[in-house]
Regions:
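A surface-exposed partner-binding patch
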Residues: 1-102, 155-191
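Low-complexity, flexible helical/coil segments
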Residues: 74, 89-94, 113-123, 137-143
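An amphipathic alpha-helical core segment
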Residues: 121-174
Length: 191
């Protein structure tokens, strides 16, 4: 496996109940994503990494949500990882030689580029201690696990009231529930 993915695996140990990809998603991925991401899927699978702080996801499960947030379907933008708080990291193929990984932060309704290549994302960005603390909300995640228990595959932690409505990034505002439903709720709030 590629070195950039190895660093990710070392930092975020794969969970026990990972799901192997089917041929349909592998064929799609081979056309749209770098081979290293496909190798991650094949060797380990979809599910929780880093005790659930991150989930490597089957893109089909988050494409509709991502494209709704972005306002259009664009198969050059593929969801690859979701945080425990439901934010989506997605791969963007910009042209034949250029790509990056961006973050859709559903709580603050913003998008930011996280790495100017998928290698930079896996080798630097996602391993950075400030990112782990502030973007992934690792400390709050640990408190939420203690309070609510581990997340099921389709669950996320979220804030009530929503952060865009004045909630806070504090355990007293955290709840646990279905990620797809909460994505839609937050999207509706902003419309």
């Amino acid at each position: 496996m590629n070195n950039c993915i190895n660093k990710f695996i070392e930092k975020y140990k794969p969970g026990e109940n990972l799901q192997k990809p089917d041929e349909e998603i592998l064929n799609f991925g081979r056309q749209m994503l770098p081979k290293e991401i496909i190798e991650l899927w094949e060797e380990y699978g979809f599910g929780e990494y880093g005790d659930g702080l991150l989930k490597v996801v089957d893109p089909r499960e988050y494409m509709n949500s991502l494209y709704t947030w972005l306002g259009q379907k664009d198969f050059n933008k593929i969801p690859i990882i979701v945080t425990a708080f439901g934010d989506i990291f997605y791969y963007r193929k910009l042209d034949d030689n250029e790509n990056d990984v961006s973050l859709l932060n559903i709580h603050y309704r913003k998008i930011e580029v996280c790495g100017y290549s998928y290698q930079e994302f896996f080798e630097e960005y996602i391993l950075d201690e400030d990112v782990i603390k502030n973007v992934l909300r690792a400390d709050l995640f640990k408190q939420a696990i203690k309070e609510f228990g581990k997340l099921d595959y389709k669950e996320i932690f979220f804030f009530t009231p929503a952060l865009v409505l004045g909630g806070g990034e504090d355990i007293k505002y955290v709840k646990k529930g279905n990620g797809a439903v909460h994505h839609q709720v937050l999207l509706q709030i902003g419309q």
